[in-house]
């Protein structure tokens, strides 16, 4: 008996067979629709508006222009696309129909042809989605090379190998080979066709290919890359994951410009949503903006087609979701700063790009400023900068700003404070708490803000000043080096400054950031240095009474001017090349650097090496717009002549050994971090030489130069002097030097156990005294301990206490060091370099096993108790109990595996049931 479902299935199959019989008269995409026994085997548009239909038989009678209808993108017989003529030979009766259009069809268009008036049966044939080619290659014209972009569809017109295109048959072969002769395509022409459509998508860019038709005619095709790119860009739209209030847009670029391109937006069902046509620009982005799109049809993608070549590219998927209710909040509900500073207020946004912020309250504070924020970069937050120094002035664009990619519009100040403050000379906002609020959206009328917070403006003050020194060639404002990273390298705290070095005044003061910001953004200062000098009064009133509006003052005065004379201040206008300011407003810190070589005082005098100069630097915020109470800090320092002094031995010589790694040291007052040279020159006939090793000044003013004297003989004399940063030889006195037999040392250390607090060196010999240092790991490892000063001589079983106990095994490297500065204190690194032999440090190494001390009573307890208990109890219990318990244990183990076994049986049962059900159905 046939079931109902089988009956339905039979009816469906019967209907499908009947439908397939009639389907022969219905159009087929890209190919054939039948009219009687005639169908289209291939269709192509080529050669600027020529259309070929290759039929499987004759149309019976010639096709005329009136028998042909043209559809472009679904539009019937559009203007400019009329059929101008039908080929007199290939009029359909030969099985080939060729006709010409009034206008070339671009490769990006959809072309459909309907031919009627055929004899016999249904008299209409339709060819849909015809291949529209961008270039035509005539294989018999020997035209040479054809340049094509990868992805173009080409038409290759045949000649059958006999020089006459009419001779092409279905056996005519077309072969495409690469430059190495490898065949990439081998095919034949369709019956009744003289045109072969060839897609270049799979060819390699930069390659040349040879086309052979019928075995004789050749044509070369060179493939280039159009480099058509469709990118989802946050700069022009809102990205790949957006909501229905965001902008859907793409950036399109190509290597060739000037040609139009068609951009089509498709939804998740591949339905066309919108189309735009724009001309592309070579290597420049062109934006296609499709505005807001519905979340219902998400995801979307954009397909862009170059109209001339037909080359296409698609964007990645763009997801559109429904927008939720927008909200805005503050990252921190309470923000604190000082009056006069620039305060950062970070606003966070959800489901919105816009928010309105209010700082202050017109009712409570008599001042409010409002602005509309836009999250242009789509990161969900906008940082607002509020300048309390300029608040209330006419130019409110300096009060509320937004840095970076985000945007700020519709800024407006209100309140009696704004009405009364007409210039920066008048008082700024009072130090107190101000309300702040933010609301999602763009409406300025805020009655119920999303979030309310507090801005606490405290009183400003000058906290401290101290001076640092830097080398004369230091580039203080180098953006690649953080000024704090210089500390300990080439920035050292000191009140003794060598002439030509840089003195850096570190000022810690709050409430001055806003004035500097105003000078840079609105008053023409090119950088923070210009802004600082413009904002601060640098000249006493007795010289110039043009005080600054901010009340900031920086006086740097020479004080050693003698009796009955005023201090001589630096003329900052004439010393502009000497001044550099580096600001750190987040920490209320400002570094004002002065190059002492270029400083000029109001008297016209400069800082010279002929005499010491005493200077008093004072920074203050005077009573005025920024504060009701003045505050200031000062620092005294002295400049002195640059000098260096070499360290000599007891005989008054700079003495080195005839070996590698010899050191020459000295002391100087120039800034630590300065790069000096020590010049050593011998005019000896036997051993003439000039050596100039470099030496870096250390934090304590010492410097050490290291040189190899192993090629020179003991007994050679030389002269030595220290050269300044600029190579100046007058920097130090010239001293006498001599080469003596090289100092020697030996050391021996063995593998050992230790509690980690000390190591024992077996033996050591130091020809000139010094120290034994212990390095961890290898010779370049950290020094973890050193001996006391050792006189010249030999030592055995030398115990060295480590700086910190070691808690695990390590390799100890023993290394003898010299006492190069003669102070009998270990000063390495810097001074006290190691003894060397053949250019390498003298060392020996050993493995140190760190072990804890074992408790004394543990070994005694273990043997007394355990042997006595075990034989008495265990043998009696084991035979009696264990045999009876073991079977139970085995049973329990089997049961423990039961659930897994049951699951396997259940699975088999299910399979069996399924097979039984199938059998019953059959």
Curated annotation (Swiss-Prot):
Residues 1-23 form the signal peptide. It is found in: Secreted, Cell wall, S-layer; Cell membrane. Residues 853-887 have a biased composition (Acidic residues). Keywords: Cell membrane, Cell wall, Cell wall biogenesis/degradation, Glycoprotein, Lipoprotein, Membrane, S-layer, Secreted, Signal, Transmembrane, Transmembrane helix. Its main location: secreted. GO terms for cellular component: extracellular region; plasma membrane; S-layer. It comes from the Archaea. Residues 888-899 have a biased composition (Low complexity). GO terms for biological process: cell wall organization. Residues 835-850 have a biased composition (Polar residues). Residues 816-899 are annotated as: Disordered. The keyword Cell membrane applies. Belongs to the halobacterial S-layer protein family. NCBIfam families: halo_sig_pep (TIGR04207), halo_surf_dom (NF045517), PGF_CTERM (TIGR04126). This is Cell surface glycoprotein 2.
């Amino acid at each position: 008996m046939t079931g109902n479902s089988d009956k339905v299935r039979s009816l469906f199959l019967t209907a499908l067979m009947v439908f397939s019989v009639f389907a022969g008269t219905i159009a087929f995409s890209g190919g054939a629709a039948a009219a009687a026994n005639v169908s289209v085997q291939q269709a192509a548009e080529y050669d600027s508006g020529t259309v070929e239909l290759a039929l499987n038989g004759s149309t019976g009678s010639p096709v005329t222009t009136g028998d042909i209808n043209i559809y472009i993108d679904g539009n019937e017989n559009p203007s400019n696309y009329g059929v101008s003529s039908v080929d007199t030979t290939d009029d359909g009766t030969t099985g080939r129909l060729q006709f010409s259009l009034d206008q070339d069809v671009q490769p990006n268009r959809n072309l459909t042809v309907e031919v009627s008036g055929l004899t016999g049966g249904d008299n209409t044939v339709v060819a849909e989605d015809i291949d529209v080619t961008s270039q035509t290659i005539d294989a018999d014209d020997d035209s040479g090379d054809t340049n094509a972009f990868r992805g173009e569809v080409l038409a290759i017109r045949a000649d059958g190998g006999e020089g006459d295109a009419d001779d092409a048959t279905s056996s005519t072969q077309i072969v495409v080979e690469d430059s190495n002769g490898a065949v990439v395509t081998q095919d034949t022409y369709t019956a009744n066709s003289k045109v072969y459509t060839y897609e270049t998508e799979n060819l390699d860019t930069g390659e040349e290919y040879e086309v052979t038709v019928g075995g004789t005619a050749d044509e070369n095709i060179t493939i280039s890359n159009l480099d058509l790119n469709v990118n989802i860009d946050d700069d022009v739209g809102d990205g790949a994951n957006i909501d229905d209030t965001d902008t859907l847009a793409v950036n399109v670029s190509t290597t060739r410009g000037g040609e139009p391109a068609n951009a089509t937006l498709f939804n998740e069902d591949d339905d066309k949503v919108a189309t735009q046509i724009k001309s592309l620009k070579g290597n420049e982005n062109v934006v296609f903006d499709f505005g807001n799109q519905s979340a219902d049809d998400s995801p979307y993608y954009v397909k862009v087609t170059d109209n001339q070549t037909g080359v296409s590219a698609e964007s990645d998927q763009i997801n559109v979701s429904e927008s939720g209710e927008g909200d805005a909040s503050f990252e921190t509900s309470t923000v604190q700063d000082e009056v006069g500073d620039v305060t950062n207020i970070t606003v966070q946004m959800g489901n919105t790009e816009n928010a309105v912020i209010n700082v202050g309250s017109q009712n409570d504070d008599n001042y409010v400023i409002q602005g509309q924020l836009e999250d242009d970069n789509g990161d969900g937050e906008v940082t607002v900068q509020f300048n309390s120094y300029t608040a209330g002035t006419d130019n409110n664009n300096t009060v509320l700003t937004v840095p970076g990619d985000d945007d700020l519009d519709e800024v407006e100040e209100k309140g009696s404070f704004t009405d009364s403050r007409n210039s920066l000379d008048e008082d700024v906002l009072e130090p107190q708490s101000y309300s702040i609020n933010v609301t999602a959206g763009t409406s300025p009328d805020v009655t119920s803000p999303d979030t309310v917070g507090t801005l606490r403006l405290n009183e400003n003050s000058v906290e401290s000043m101290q001076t640092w020194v830097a080398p004369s060639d230091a580039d203080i404002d180098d953006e690649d080096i953080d000024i704090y990273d210089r500390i300990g390298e080439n920035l050292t705290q000191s009140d003794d400054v060598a002439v030509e070095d840089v003195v850096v005044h570190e000022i810690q003061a709050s409430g001055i950031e806003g004035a500097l910001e105003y000078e840079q953004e609105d008053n023409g200062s090119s950088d923070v240095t210009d802004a600082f000098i413009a904002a601060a009064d640098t000249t006493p009133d007795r010289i110039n009474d043009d005080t600054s509006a901010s009340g900031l003052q920086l006086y740097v005065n020479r004080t050693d001017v003698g009796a009955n004379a005023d201090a001589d201040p630096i003329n900052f206008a004439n010393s502009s090349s000497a001044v550099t300011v580096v600001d750190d407003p987040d920490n209320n810190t400002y570094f004002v650097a002065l190059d002492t070589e270029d400083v000029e005082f109001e008297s016209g005098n400069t800082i010279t090496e002929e005499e010491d100069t005493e200077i008093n630097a004072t920074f203050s915020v005077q009573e005025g717009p920024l504060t009701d109470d003045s505050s200031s800090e000062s620092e005294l320092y002295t400049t002195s002549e640059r000098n260096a002094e070499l360290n000599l031995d007891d005989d008054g010589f700079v003495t080195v050994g005839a070996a590698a790694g010899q050191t020459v040291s000295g002391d100087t007052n120039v800034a630590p971090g300065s790069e000096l040279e020590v010049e050593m020159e011998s005019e000896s006939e036997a051993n003439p030489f000039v050596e100039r090793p470099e030496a870096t000044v250390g934090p304590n003013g010492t410097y050490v130069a290291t040189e190899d004297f192993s090629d020179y003989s003991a007994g050679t004399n030389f002269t030595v002097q220290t050269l300044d940063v600029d190579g100046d030889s007058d920097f130090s006195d010239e001293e006498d030097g001599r080469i003596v037999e090289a100092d020697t040392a030996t050391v021996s250390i063995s593998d050992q156990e230790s509690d980690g607090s000390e190591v024992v060196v077996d033996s050591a010999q130091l020809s000139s005294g010094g120290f034994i240092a212990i390095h961890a790991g290898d010779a370049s490892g950290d020094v973890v301990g050193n001996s006391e000063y050792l006189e010249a001589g030999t030592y055995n079983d030398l115990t060295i206490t480590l700086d910190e106990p070691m808690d695990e095994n390590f390799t100890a490297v023993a290394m003898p060091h010299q006492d190069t500065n003669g102070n009998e204190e270990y000063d390495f690194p810097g001074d006290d370099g190691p003894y060397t032999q053949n250019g390498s440090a003298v060392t020996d190494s050993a493995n140190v096993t760190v072990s804890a001390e074992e408790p004394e009573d543990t070994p005694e307890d273990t043997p007394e108790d355990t042997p006595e208990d075990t034989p008495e109890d265990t043998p009696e219990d084991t035979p009696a109990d264990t045999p009876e318990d073991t079977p139970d244990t085995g049973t329990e183990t089997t049961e423990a595996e039961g659930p897994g076994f049951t699951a396997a049986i259940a699975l088999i049962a299910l399979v069996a049931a399924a097979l039984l059900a199938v059998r019953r159905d059959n």
